[in-house]
Amino acid sequence: MVVINKQLMVSGILPAWLKNEYDLEDKIISTVGAGRIGYRVLERLVAFNPKKLLYYDYQELPAEAINRLNEASKLFNGRGDIVQRVEKLEDMVAQSDVVTINCPLHKDSRGLFNKKLISHMKDGAYLVNTARGAICVAEDVAEAVKSGKLAGYGGDVWDKQPAPKDHPWRTMDNKDHVGNAMTVHISGTSLHAQKRYAQGVKNILNSYFSKKFDYRPQDIIVQNGSYATRAYGQKK
């Protein structure tokens, strides 16, 4: 919006597509994946007074986590019980105004959002992918934006990085010449983010070379030849 506002200030012309601008208030918003990142997305969405917050995950959120979201919504928005788990992905996207992707990339999620799954989404819904680009089929997303099936697609991740010049996500748009909110994977370039990365690497190296091996659980991905976390596709 900062870029758009600057363009408006220079041109003085109000673009026609602004007539299709909506708030998140009273909308049904969902997340694919409700782990550490997905849950934080839900926390932030409460402030926009959504009608429902849906999530799709192989396991339920702890009751305490759900209660925290519902209580915040009731306190600030006057309505509780907005959080709901949906067991079938097709059912969730069919009722969502906005779908956000917050799950890891693994064999079961690669190409998950293809033409078939997108066909189950509401006409004019928005799809936001800040997880991994390859979770979506690039050509299918571009076609959905062009046809108007999706009102828009946004993300900071690409299925190929750096994206080739002819990548469909570079130029896709709809009849109003909008619907494309792609950025070039720069969400982690803030000074604060870089400091966190550096500190995390330092902690891991110090733990290893001191032979303490007291790693934080979230820093361990593989242990004893298998995944140490259930975030990469394994359900047991």
Swiss-Prot record:
Has keyword NAD? yes
Q: Gene3D superfamilies of this UniProt entry?
A: NAD(P)-binding Rossmann-like Domain
Q: Which organism is it from?
A: Saccharomyces cerevisiae (strain ATCC 204508 / S288c)
MF annotations from Gene Ontology: NAD binding; oxidoreductase activity
Q: Which UniProt keywords apply?
A: NAD, Oxidoreductase
InterPro entries of this UniProt entry?
A: D-isomer_DH_CS, D-isomer_DH_NAD-bd, NAD(P)-bd_dom_sf
Q: Which Pfam families match?
A: 2-Hacid_dh_C
Task: Give me the residues that bind NAD(+), please.
Answer: R36, I37, D57, P104, L105, H106, K107, D108, T130, D156, H185, I186, S187, G188
- Residues under site feature: Important for catalytic activity: R132, H185
Name of the featured protein: Truncated formate dehydrogenase 2
* Family that this chain belongs to: Belongs to the D-isomer specific 2-hydroxyacid dehydrogenase family. FDH subfamily.
Q: Which domain of life is it from?
A: Eukaryota
